[in-house]
Amino acid sequence: IPYDRLLIATGSRPFVPPMEGLSTVKNRFSFMTLDDARALDRVLTPQSRVLIVGAGLIGLKCAEGILHRVAKVQVVDLAPRILPSILDETGSAMVQESLEKQGVSILTGTTVERFDGNHATLTSGDTCDFDVLVVAVGVRANTELAKEAGALVGRGIQVDSEGRTSLPDVFAAGDCTETRDLSSGTTHVMAILPNAYLQGEAAGQAMAGHHAPFDNAIPMNAIGFFHLHMVTAGSYDGQELVWQEKASYKKLVIRDGK
């Protein structure tokens, strides 16, 4: 198909780490698309024991969504605490306590070493029997098309502030790209909705001959678990100002007077 300008918006896909015996698990799922959710929904029963590998946003939202429809939800994560990429130790502990009060079982600092059908052996030596497995350990950028075409690719497709790749007349936007993080000055994949649509708008404007760069991306999340709501934005390296009460925790980080 001939084109004058091309946009690559191939998004991301679930990352499934190598785990011994994974193929022996019959009911195993990712939790990223509507089709994933529907497939999971079809196998759940009130007697189901669900094992979720991954205590990030995707895994914990899955746990919240299915908890009262099944017999047990067990979450495991190799990281030392839940949500380590967006919360500090205090914030993680508050969210974990809230989830555990609702009935979600959480083990951190361990992950699955091997599967034997519906039996999992963890790296800690613990074991877990389950009926349904959900793997939710993160996503990876879909960069294969751009890479095969010869574009510069790191963890994501490398683009400028208007979505231009290293290839002439080829643009990219969204979860498949790397973005400059205004808050930290680093460049990395920022797989969040606001970044995706603002990148897409900038690329579309450039493809139409206009100039509307997007160069102020900031990692941000607004989410809740069982009525405990949280908002995070930016990076956390700097002077900390903390306000904490029994059911409230606020932290403001200042760096270079900002």
Where are these regions (language model features)?
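FAD-binding beta-loop-beta segment adjacent to the flavin cofactor pocket
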Residues: 14, 160-171, 236-251
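Rossmann-like dinucleotide-binding cores of NAD(P)H-dependent redox enzymes
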Residues: 49, 57-113, 195, 214-225
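Glycine-rich dinucleotide-binding loop and its adjacent helix/turn
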Residues: 5-69
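FAD-site-proximal beta/loop scaffold in flavoenzymes
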Residues: 24-45, 118-121, 127-202
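Redox-cofactor binding/interface segments in oxidoreductases and associated redox assembly factors
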Residues: 8-9, 52, 122, 135, ...
